[in-house]
Amino acid sequence: MEQIKRHLRSAAGYLAVCAKWLVLAALVGCVVGPLGGAFGLALNWANATRGAYPWLLYLLPVAGLVIVFLYHRFDPDGGGSTNQIFVSVREHKPLTLRTAPLIFVSTVATHLFGGSSGREGAALLLGGSVSGQLGRALRLENRDCRLMTMCGMAGAFSAIFGTPLAATIFTLEVVDVGSMQYAALLPCLVSALLGVFISGKMGLAPEAFVLQAEAAPTPDNLVRVIILGALLSALSIFFCELLHVTPKLYRKFFPNIYLRVATGGVLIIALTKLLGTTDYNGAGTAVIEAAIDGEAVPCAFLLKMLFTALTLGAGFKGGEIVPIFFTGATFGCVAAPLLGLPPQLGAALGMVALFCGCTNSPLASICLAIEVFGGQCVSLFALACAVSYMLSSYFSLYREQHFLHSKLRIVGVQRVHGHWSETDAAHLTTNDDGEN
């Protein structure tokens, strides 16, 4: 009888915790869903408005000055970096509430006036800051505020991109690579599902494509996909390093933050006029769609990386993920025919596998492929992501991303003097290039 009572008490405890997080996760989803939807609609408006009024590009340096002033005045320590949310989750420290309006306004301004940036990284900050402060307002413990922050990240990511499964797994996977907090699975998924439902009701359509060309997983095609995955891993390393080096160069030559951002705006204007196209301003979703349809300019991936690095490095705001999609899709579209793969499939593989290499989130990348491309060629997507993940070493888009396990052996890794090293004494190696 006592054993039965213990089991009943245990079951009651599980049910109570489950009910608690269903309610809290639903609350987060109902809060960040409208925010994410409004953010996505505002960015769509910004890009459409810039297309209708090309002269707005000439105001980009002025917009940069306003953005820098706002951050210098209201968030001098944060700076609007996605790395903030990683620290918040790892150290159980909710972001300040002012993070949300700052990243919202500054990202919309960057897109409106022609900067090259994305939106998902900004959405992580938007949702994470609001939900973390919601946890504080409810007087939750620090560890529960951490989970609330993760729910907000998943909910906002899902709301703006329309991929609840990828948003959930990405939130669990990306902060500490190799350690997924499965206790957060249900709450994050609930927030993500509600987030995408609400944003859909607001009129924000989810990202979805239909592949016009497929390939069977034959041995020949598997080899081709492995080669493409290896090329994308190299491209991910280059892109990550470019995004890390560019701010250092800006700081070296332009120590004044206002001169720095104004210079970045002028450079974007000059490059846009030199090229005679606005394809590389804003998010560039039209170019992504064209690449998945099999059309891409051979040098488009290089130019998008350059525009994005110049924009974000100067101090403009926004995410990096959509530019990664742009870069991967255009590169894959161009490279795939050289390997004997359809350009449409190559663009899709490039989009997902480059995302994997830059963010070190293979499971989320596979989920992204399933949701965005409807499960077509899922085995090829998984293979490309696996190769890109392994060969991208310990480079990362995010400096605050930590690695817990080796990518090459079943051993742990630790950071020693800024480099990730295997902890197995028998195979102790130091990656001199994998500094984050």
Report residues per predicted region.
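Alpha-helical transmembrane segments and immediately membrane-proximal extracytoplasmic
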Residues: 1-436
